[in-house]
Amino acid sequence: MAEQVTEATASGVFCSRILNMVNSEDVNAIILAQRHMLDRFEKTNEMLLNFNGLSNTRLQQMSDRFAHHTRTLVEMKKDLDIIFRRIRMLKGKLAKQYPESFNNVHESPILEDDDDFDPTPRSAATTIATSEQSTESCDTSPSIISPAMSQDFEDLSQAPSDTPSVNGQILTDEEVVHED
């Protein structure tokens, strides 16, 4: 029994010396730092969960829009295929009904293949394209596709202008002097 008392005393002495080596203020500081880090990690986790939820919502919205635009493009392609098929069919009918006239058309030069042919002057085309780009964003409304059908389309060729022009062409200073 005496040995057990000395062992308990020896182990008690050993534990008390180990506990005396550890500073309780340092332990409390470590615990406070860990609680502070835990709070920060919880806030960060909450922010990441909110961001993830928002990202999922945006992804769903964009996926829906992408699917809608893809369907629109597929439908437009089908419509164009039908239109071109009808055009080929009409060409075939015209070739059968009026073979001489149809052959004469193919022998004459085609204006569409001529790179120098431009029905609108460059300045007007640039002005129209720039005004459309600046007033509309990436919108697929009919006003972008066909400006002539839009009520908001501004016809620049009909507007009074301070610069002299003839037949839609802007005159240079020399031409203005000769014009007067």
Curated annotation (Swiss-Prot):
Alphabetic keyword roster: Lysosome, Membrane
Any GO BP annotation: vesicle-mediated transport
Localization: Lysosome membrane
GO CC terms of this entry: BORC complex; lysosomal membrane
Bias type Polar residues, positions: 126-144, 158-170
Region of interest (Disordered), residue spans: 126-180
Alphabetical list of InterPro entries matching this protein: KXD1-like (IPR039843), KxDL_dom (IPR019371)
Chain coiled-coil ranges: none
Pfam families assigned to the protein according to its UniProt record, in alphabetical order: KxDL
Membership in a protein family: Belongs to the KXD1 family.
Assembly: Associates with the BLOC-1 complex.
Function, in words: As part of a BORC-like complex may play a role in lysosomes movement and localization at the cell periphery. Associated with the cytosolic face of lysosomes, this complex may couple lysosomes to microtubule plus-end-directed kinesin motor. May also be involved in the biogenesis of lysosome-related organelles such as melanosomes.
Protein name, per record: KxDL motif-containing protein 1
